A protein has these predicted regions:
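Gly/Pro/Ser/Thr-rich low-complexity, intrinsically disordered segments predominantly at protein N-termini
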Residues: 1-228
Length: 228
């Protein structure tokens, strides 16, 4: 998915450079400055503002289109109800600040397994890496969702990542896979269309028709079944 250079390749390139020490020193100074900027961002951020801190910059989000909002609401109905019914964990839509390395994100939907939330404080503002994240594409966010966020989510152990295209009505499902002598990597489980069925691997036994993500009537039908 991402075209970003591999971490090992970047490290090798720096260490092979004759002024590697100067590059590292300059990077350290930049990261110290960025950390101060990030602290100011967190103090400035309020519940009424949707913004993220990505690679040293504050990224503001404009109001979403109706189709984006409908998809987000449909997903929250399904995943929120399923997680509560089976006591699986915590679900957040849009406003949970996620700390991943140097960046702070507010995913469209995030889920944490119950055992990871038992000692959470009700006043906490900054959250650890979720077990499951969903991002809904828009023109302004699609590059970040497919590249910067993809790399961050993968490298910080997010177990499952869905990228949803609300215009094409498609869901791309990525699952974190462990391999011997290698870092965990996302693998594409499949791209699912409106007439297909999708199985969530993190929320055990959740099998949903993709139509329930995009269509209000199909969503209501599926949610009604979940309540039985």
């Amino acid at each position: 998915m991402s075209n970003s250079p591999k971490q090992d390749d970047l490290f090798h390139d720096i260490m092979e450079h004759p002024i590697a020490d100067q590059i590292i020193e300059r990077a350290n100074q930049a990261m110290e400055k960025e950390a101060r900027h990030r602290a100011n961002f967190r103090e400035w951020l309020t519940p009424s503002v949707k913004a993220e801190f990505i690679n040293g910059e504050i990224v503001m989000h404009s109001p979403v289109k109706r189709r984006h909002l409908r998809v987000a609401e449909n997903l929250h109905y399904i995943i929120g109800l399923y997680a509560r019914k089976h006591n699986l964990g915590e679900v957040s839509i849009e406003k949970a600040l996620i700390e991943l390395g140097r960046n702070d994100y507010e995913p469209d939907l995030a889920f944490w397994l119950k055992e990871r939330t038992l000692e959470w404080d009700n006043d906490m503002m900054v959250h650890p890496a979720p077990d499951f994240i969903i991002e809904i594409l828009s023109e302004s966010t699609k590059d970040r969702d497919r590249n910067t966020k993809y790399v961050s989510y993968e490298s910080h152990g997010v177990g499952e990542y869905w990228i949803i295209d609300p215009v094409k009505e498609l869901v791309e499902q990525f699952v974190l896979v462990s391999k011997p002598n290698s870092k965990d990597k996302f693998e594409l489980q499949g791209t699912f269309g409106i007439d297909e069925v999708l199985t969530c691997l993190v929320l055990k036994d959740l099998v949903l028709p993709v139509a329930a993500i995009f269509d209000a009537q199909e969503n209501m039908k599926f949610v009604t079944e979940l309540t039985k």
